[in-house]
Each structure stands twice: as C-alpha cells, then as structure tokens.
Amino acid sequence: MKDKLLSLLLIFATNCFSDTSEQLNNFFNNELFFIQTSINKLNNISDESKGTYIKNDDKSIVIEINSPFREKYFINNNEIKIHDLDFNQIKKIPINDKNETMLINFLSDGFPKNFNNKITINEKIFFIDFINENTVQIKFKDNMQIDNVIKFYKND
C-alpha cells in the first residue's frame, strides 16, 4: 500500500513538472506584453519598464522596451544585439557561456521536462510561476541585490 501511494505521488509529481514545462513552452511561444518592476529596498526606489516579447520561428527572440526608454534586443544562439532607439546606437554582446544565459536558452529552446519553478545561474535564483493562464511572473535579485519582478501577459 505504501509503495503504491509513493508510486502514485511520483507519477503525479512527474506529470506536474512536465505539464509546467509544456505550459511554459506554450506560453512563451506567444507574443507577450511585459512589465518589469525593480525595487531598491535600501533607497525605497521603484522603477518600471514596459515592452513586448516575441519568439520567432527560428527560436530567436525580440524584446522591445517602450518605456521609460526605447530599446530593442535581438537574441539568438550566438549574440545579443541591443538597439538603443533613442540614441540610434547598436551594441553586440557575444554569447560565450551558455550557463550565463540559461534563462534565455530555456525561452529560446524550451523548458526541460523536469523543470520546477526555479533556475539557479551563478548563485542568482530565478523563480518562474504562473499567476493565471494568461500571466507568468519571473522574480529574481540582480547583481546589486535589487528585487526584480517581470510579469508577462498574453495579448488577447
């Protein structure tokens, strides 16, 4: 009896993880609107950025920030190209370390079947949770210990 219960729990847990992975992969295949809120608790200052997220058929990603400034990010397996639309400048950053860009890899290539809601990259922890079927939230502290929350919304 105890073994059967344990087996059922393991099957349920595996299904939950694969369902979460599949749901996240389906969610991030949509054109999304996002709001990123950064909260500096030391200074009690809050900043907000707004923009769009698009994953292309070739698995490249385009992120456009519309507020408070205008930037466009083109992300592929080799580089991140940043267009500062206000100053008409372009900066290219090569992607050398795939561990550094694990979150980008998941967004581009898909979340693994055994994914839970946490990613650890160089001691930074990212929590990814569904708020509801149309909203996903990513929470993390950046390298300056500022709390960041990015909420992605499906465009309906």
Model-based region annotation:
Residues 86-125:
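Flexible, surface-exposed loop/linker segments and immediately adjacent secondary-structure boundaries
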Residues 4-14:
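Sec-dependent N-terminal signal peptides
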Residues 54-102:
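An acidic-aromatic
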Residues 112-156:
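Gly/Pro-enriched, hydrophobic low-complexity segments
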Residues 49-54, 73, 150-154:
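Hydrophobic/aromatic beta-strand elements that line small-molecule binding cavities or substrate pockets
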